[in-house]
Amino acid sequence: GNSVLSGFNVEFLAHSLNTKEDTAKRLRSPQDERGQIVKVEDGLHIISPELQEEEEQSHSQRKEEEEEEQEQRHRKHSKKEDEDEDEEEEEEREQRHRKHSEKEEEDEDEPRSYETRRKWKKHTAEKKRESHGQGEEEEELEKEEEEEEEIQRQHSKGRKNGLEETICSAKIRENIARPSRGDLYNSGAGRISTVNSLTLPILRNLRLSAEYVLLYRNGIYAPHWNINANSLLYVIRGEGRVRIVNSEGNKVFDDKVSLGQLVVVPQNFVVAQQAGNEEGFEYVVFKTNDRAAVSHVNQVFRATPGEVLANAFGLRHSQVAQIKSNGNRGPLVQPQSQ
């Protein structure tokens, strides 16, 4: 059966993974006809480090012991603390009650909201008019209402256009080509910079992100794929080769691209780029997700247990060690021939 790497030639795959060509051949076309669903004769086991299990067990035991000790200490002190707290709360309640009762006798509480204050003042003014007449009280009430409206306008002025002000003041420009801005770097291969909604929040509204890639001469951006986004590659300088393989291992694109050309890479299609011999290869990738996620083949291999790789691709342990332990630990690769 074919693997997803079947669409890449053996030489390029060996350079990308920094391994020998016979190992690359196994990865490209493993001698295995089992397909995607297999029957396990001796039972299925999950490969996991034993030390990790022991550490988790000891950690859980320590956690349980600490919780028991905390409960015991809590039970010892809770009774006394509850009694003290009850006494203090009772005293505070009595003090508050005395203060409130005295204040209520002197004056009624004034309402806080604008509408209720207005009604309250009208009610007070009506009482005054009944006993003292209407002239001076009405003028005083009108002045107070005008003052209240002015205060209300001042408070609402800052909130009226909050969303528009946020958008107008938002940062809309980011220079991801700046060398100090690089997220991934290989002194012999190049550098990669990304920008998404975490670094430029306005991209959340656009639902877009971008990736800037600069490959030095013969530098390789090893096979990788976008998990949650389609992408559009635009060349801004130099020339390089772009290889695209679909999820069935079939080659769908393998050609050189140069300044001003576009290449569309669908989601979950494996893509790899390599700069030419004469000059570097500089391009930007626009992605249809503001937090696009990328998986790299070489990092997936390094994270996969060696026994799984050996059984899946028919590799010897020495070949597995080449894949997992050799240089070029990031997605940017400098070919060994350089």
UniProtKB/Swiss-Prot annotation:
Can you name the source organism?
A: Pisum sativum
Protein family membership: Belongs to the 11S seed storage protein (globulins) family.
Tell me which residues make up the Cupin type-1 domain. Answer: 174-321
Record region (Disordered): 16-162
Gene symbol here is: LEGB
Per UniProt, the ranges with Basic and acidic residues bias are 18-44
**The keyword Disulfide bond is assigned to this record:** yes
What is the name listed in the Swiss-Prot or TrEMBL entry for this protein?
A: Legumin B
What functional role does this protein have? This protein found in the seeds of many leguminous and non-leguminous plants is the source of sulfur-containing amino acids in seed meals.
> What Gene Ontology molecular-function terms does this entry list?
nutrient reservoir activity
